[in-house]
C-alpha cells in the first residue's frame, strides 16, 4: 500500500525550520530532556454547539444497559439454607460510602512545639496557658525600619545604594524644605489676626497703580495706532496722486505722438481745384472736423501758434477776407495761452508743468482749426499754386518738422 505523504501547511513548515536551526531532528521530543511532544499541536475548528470535553461518539461507545445489569446483579444476594434458596436484595445504605465524623482532637490545631534537628523545643509552658489565651488573636508585630534593615542584612529596594550611590543630599534638601514650610506655617498662624489689617492698605495702593499703568498703556497703544493710520492714509493719498499724474502724462504723450504722425502723414501736396463750389468745400470741412473729433488727431503748433504741417501757398479768390487777419488772430491766441501759463507757473511742479505745456499745444491747435474753418466758411477758398513750387517747398518743410520734433524731445527730457 502506498502511503500518501502528509501535506504540511505554511505555518508547520516555518515551525520545523525554526526547530531545525536549534538542533532539533525529526522524532525527538521537545524540552531539555527531549521527553516532550513529538507531534505538533493541530488547531481544529469547532463547528458545533457542544461544550468542552463532550464526546460525540459516547452514545455509540457507552453501554449503559450492561452497567445497569451488573449493578442490579451485585445488589442481589443468594442465600442457601435449610428452607432452600433465598434471594435477598441489599439495602441502598450498604452501597453508600460511610463518612465518619472527625474527632474533636483535630478540629482545631494548636501548635505546641517546633522540630529543630530532630529535637522538640516547646514554645511556652503548656501549664500556664489557658483557653482564653488560645482563643484571643495575637496582634501582628510591626517591625521598624532598623529592624527590617537588620533582617534584610542591609539590602534595600534602592539597588543603587548597594554600590554606594545614595540620596543623602536629596533627602537633606527635602528635610530642609519641610522645616522651612513648617516654620512659615507657624509664623502665619501667629500673625493671623494682625496680618489682614496691615496688608489691606498696600493691596489697595497696588490696585490703583495697576489701574493707572493699564490706562497709560491703553492710551499709548491708541496713540500709536492713530499715528500709524494717519501715516498710512497720507502715504496712500500721495501714491494715488502720483499714479494719476503718471497715467495722465502717459495718455497725453501717446496723443501727441499720434498727432505728430498724423501731421507728418497729412503734410503731402494737396491740390485744390478752383472750379469747386462753396457747398462741396463746406462738406469737406465738416468731414475733416468730425474726423478730428473722433480720432483726436490735431495739427502740431509751434511756439507762436502757427501750423507746422506743410500747407501750399494759396491766394484768396474772394476779396472779402484777408489772410493776414487770420495770422493776427493766431498770434493773439498764442499770447493768451502764454499769459495763462505764466500766471500758474509759480505753484506748479515739474510733472504739472509738462501737462500744462501739452494742454497749451492742444489749445493752440484748436484755435488754429477754428480760425481756418471760420475764414473758409465766409466764402474765401484757397487755391494752390503751381505744382513745381509746391514740390520745391515740400522737402524743406519736412526737414523743419524733423528739427522741431528733436527740439521738443530735448525740452521734455530737460524738464
From Swiss-Prot:
<dbReference type="Pfam" id="PF01585">
    <property type="entry name" value="G-patch"/>
</dbReference>
<feature type="compositionally biased region" description="Acidic residues">
    <location>
        <begin position="335"/>
        <end position="345"/>
    </location>
</feature>
<keyword id="KW-0597">Phosphoprotein</keyword>
<feature type="region of interest" description="Disordered">
    <location>
        <begin position="116"/>
        <end position="141"/>
    </location>
</feature>
<feature type="modified residue" description="Phosphoserine">
    <location>
        <position position="130"/>
    </location>
</feature>
<feature type="compositionally biased region" description="Basic and acidic residues">
    <location>
        <begin position="387"/>
        <end position="397"/>
    </location>
</feature>
<feature type="compositionally biased region" description="Basic residues">
    <location>
        <begin position="353"/>
        <end position="364"/>
    </location>
</feature>
<feature type="modified residue" description="Phosphothreonine">
    <location>
        <position position="116"/>
    </location>
</feature>
<feature type="modified residue" description="N-acetylmethionine">
    <location>
        <position position="1"/>
    </location>
</feature>
<dbReference type="GO" id="GO:0005654">
    <property type="term" value="C:nucleoplasm"/>
</dbReference>
<dbReference type="InterPro" id="IPR000467">
    <property type="entry name" value="G_patch_dom"/>
</dbReference>
<keyword id="KW-1017">Isopeptide bond</keyword>
<keyword id="KW-0832">Ubl conjugation</keyword>
<feature type="compositionally biased region" description="Basic and acidic residues">
    <location>
        <begin position="224"/>
        <end position="239"/>
    </location>
</feature>
<keyword id="KW-0007">Acetylation</keyword>
<dbReference type="GO" id="GO:0005730">
    <property type="term" value="C:nucleolus"/>
</dbReference>
<feature type="compositionally biased region" description="Basic residues">
    <location>
        <begin position="398"/>
        <end position="407"/>
    </location>
</feature>
<dbReference type="GO" id="GO:0003676">
    <property type="term" value="F:nucleic acid binding"/>
</dbReference>
<protein>
    <recommendedName>
        <fullName>G patch domain-containing protein 4</fullName>
    </recommendedName>
</protein>
<dbReference type="InterPro" id="IPR050656">
    <property type="entry name" value="PINX1"/>
</dbReference>
<feature type="domain" description="G-patch">
    <location>
        <begin position="11"/>
        <end position="57"/>
    </location>
</feature>
<feature type="compositionally biased region" description="Basic and acidic residues">
    <location>
        <begin position="118"/>
        <end position="141"/>
    </location>
</feature>
<feature type="compositionally biased region" description="Polar residues">
    <location>
        <begin position="191"/>
        <end position="201"/>
    </location>
</feature>
<feature type="region of interest" description="Disordered">
    <location>
        <begin position="191"/>
        <end position="415"/>
    </location>
</feature>
<feature type="cross-link" description="Glycyl lysine isopeptide (Lys-Gly) (interchain with G-Cter in SUMO2)">
    <location>
        <position position="46"/>
    </location>
</feature>
<feature type="modified residue" description="Phosphoserine">
    <location>
        <position position="258"/>
    </location>
</feature>
<dbReference type="GO" id="GO:0002244">
    <property type="term" value="P:hematopoietic progenitor cell differentiation"/>
</dbReference>
<feature type="modified residue" description="Phosphothreonine">
    <location>
        <position position="4"/>
    </location>
</feature>
